[in-house]
Amino acid sequence: MEKARPQWGHPLQFVFACISYAVGLGNVWRFPYLCQMYGGGSFLVPYIIMLIVEGMPLLYLELAVGQRMRQGSIGAWRTISPYLSGVGVASVVVSFFLSMYYNVINAWGFWYLFHSFQDPLPWSVCPLNSNHTGYDEECEKASSTQYFWYRKTLNISPSIQENGGVQWEPALCLTLAWLMVYLCILRGTESTGKVVYFTASMPYCVLIIYLVRGLTLHGATNGLMYMFTPKMEQLANPKAWINAATQIFFSLGLGFGSLIAFASYNEPSNNCQKHAIIVSIINSSTSIFASIVTFSIYGFKATFNYENCLNKVILLLTNSFDLEDGFLTVSNLEEVKNYLASTYPNKYSEVFPHIRNCSLESELDTAVQGTGLAFIVYTEAIKNMEVSQLWSVLYFFMLLMLGIGSMLGNTAAILTPLTDSKVISSYLPKEAISGLVCLINCAVGMVFTMEAGNYWFDIFNDYAATLSLLLIVLVETIAVCYVYGLKRFESDLRAMTGRTLSWYWKVMWAFVSPLLIVGLFIFYLSDYILTGTLQYQAWDATQGQLVTKDYPPHALAVIGLLVASSTMCIPLVALGTFIRNRLKRGGSAPVA
């Protein structure tokens, strides 16, 4: 007798699992960057439009497929057509790539969390040099937060060609991160269903605390005004629309197979349409909410740096011209500078090269995303807060909850097809399958703990999923609407849920969403081709800053392999199925 499929203990567990998976680090460190780059409040216009015409429909499609087929990604697409098994295989491959490197972020989160209990915070001041005669030269040229990130955390090499060895401290943190994930997925939906209540809700508690604190910080209004002041001319910028569509697409986690896996454990009568709308709205609302928190803190940091810059100029002029202490202030600085320049032109010309150009606008214009925002910009702001240890612990605890929540979805996309397989599950219990997947990912992930590990992390982050996911979701929409048949799928949904599919979903699935995906695919493909030689940012310790370098041939080969290994699964599996069917027909033909 076939074993009954596990189910979520309560529909809320499914919703929380989807929220925990979809609401991730990208909401905190990518969406605020896009707002900053593409017109502040005006970026919300293309973002909301793309949510309606792309995000919600595609999320509903994946949830409906998982709930209808009641299998992981491979089995679900094989049920629709044996020739489409490669879509599920491609999803598993991409999820495997993502799991390899994504948990490294959680390892860094653990590293910073452990160091957050020190007083003072280790990234708040530069260490002394070996002679104890001054500060470390690399740290002085960069900043204390950059030094802690690039030298103490990553111990980064000058280029991707100098790999170095595995570093034991990051390796231990990565092992701990994978142990945490394993404990959360150990019993399948039984354990994951309980964990997601915490991983989904805890980040909101921290964000609310940070919002209250952020709004009371000096200069917070400068950041919020910068965010909410719309630059309407950006609406005519095609890249604003492309990035809005891309952010919606990747933020919801479409194409990985995680959503299909989660939905496969639902009751067939579950209202997945309602849940798709809820999850997509909560995900986008979280991005906007996180941006308000980020920009309030960003405004504090920018104002702090701006005023610090002004104070250094005041000190320089006061000492150079023997002015009375307190005579020169921020309010009369420009007036006094003009007076000194006209009265003492020769002396002022000597001092002028050392006078820094202080600008609040330029501080706010400094756009940073990804690990730079999470581990450098935020820590720069935190170190200047009162009771900085508390805010640091809260912040990195939140990052860990977001990261682990996303990892639960990533691993579900891999594990569900494996546990669905009768061959594999007949030999190994699900605890052993989960353990093997975590162990393999952890072992391969050690590459990212080497001195050149951050460069390999960037390669995986930039190239392992982008084109592959667009192709996967495009084939998914074509498969449902034109292979399985939209009318047939509509009939299935009506039989399952008792609800009729509205014209909106049908138009989006059949026409609008596929055309948008094709447009994104063409954009990214042409962008890669027109870019020419692919480049990366390397840390130069002698200058204390990032420099641009060309990827070496072996790195380009890895990039090509990452893109091809997942995208080629779709045509290769289809071709293999076709050949196998032809051979079966040929073998079963009657002998004359």
UniProtKB/Swiss-Prot annotation:
Question: Mind telling me which GO cellular component terms the entry cites?
Answer: apical plasma membrane
Q: Can you tell me which residues the record assigns to a coiled coil? A: none
Tell me which parts of the chain lie in the Cytoplasmic compartment.
1-7, 64-79, 187-194, 263-276, 411-431, 487-504, 576-592
- Which residue ranges does the entry give as Extracellular-facing topology? 29-42, 101-165, 216-241, 298-389, 453-465, 526-554
- What SUPFAM superfamilies does its record include? SNF-like
Which tissues does the record link to its expression?
Answer: Expressed in brain, kidney, small intestine, thymus, spleen and lung. In the brain, expressed in cerebellum, cortex and brain stem. Not detected in liver, muscle or heart. In brain, widespread in various regions, including the meninges, choroid plexus, cortex, hippocampus and thalamus.
Q: Which UniProt keywords apply?
A: Amino-acid transport, Cell membrane, Glycoprotein, Membrane, Symport, Transmembrane, Transmembrane helix, Transport
UniProt keyword annotation of tRNA-binding present: no
Name the Pfam families on file: SNF
Is Protease set as a keyword in this record? no
Its topology with respect to the membrane? Multi-pass membrane protein
* Glycosylation sites (chain numbering): 131
- Kindly state which reaction or reactions the protein catalyses: L-proline(out) + chloride(out) + 2 Na(+)(out) = L-proline(in) + chloride(in) + 2 Na(+)(in); 4-hydroxy-L-proline(out) + chloride(out) + 2 Na(+)(out) = 4-hydroxy-L-proline(in) + chloride(in) + 2 Na(+)(in); 2-methyl-2-(methylamino)propanoate(out) + chloride(out) + 2 Na(+)(out) = 2-methyl-2-(methylamino)propanoate(in) + chloride(in) + 2 Na(+)(in); L-pipecolate(out) + chloride(out) + 2 Na(+)(out) = L-pipecolate(in) + chloride(in) + 2 Na(+)(in)
Output the GO biological process annotations, alphabetical, semicolon-separated: amino acid transport; amino-acid betaine transport; glycine import across plasma membrane; L-proline import across plasma membrane; proline import across plasma membrane; proline transmembrane transport
* An MF annotation (GO) of this entry: proline:sodium symporter activity
As for subcellular location, the record says:
Apical cell membrane
Report TM segments: 8-28, 43-63, 80-100, 166-186, 195-215, 242-262, 277-297, 390-410, 432-452, 466-486, 505-525, 555-575
Q: Which family does it belong to?
A: Belongs to the sodium:neurotransmitter symporter (SNF) (TC 2.A.22) family. SLC6A20 subfamily.
Function comment:
Mediates the Na(+)- and Cl(-)-dependent uptake of imino acids such as L-proline, N-methyl-L-proline and pipecolate as well as N-methylated amino acids. Also transports glycine, regulates proline and glycine homeostasis in the brain playing a role in the modulation of NMDAR currents.
What is the name of the protein in this document?
Sodium- and chloride-dependent transporter XTRP3A
Q: Which organism is it from?
A: Mus musculus (Mouse)
Taxonomy of the source species: Eukaryota, Metazoa, Chordata, Craniata, Vertebrata
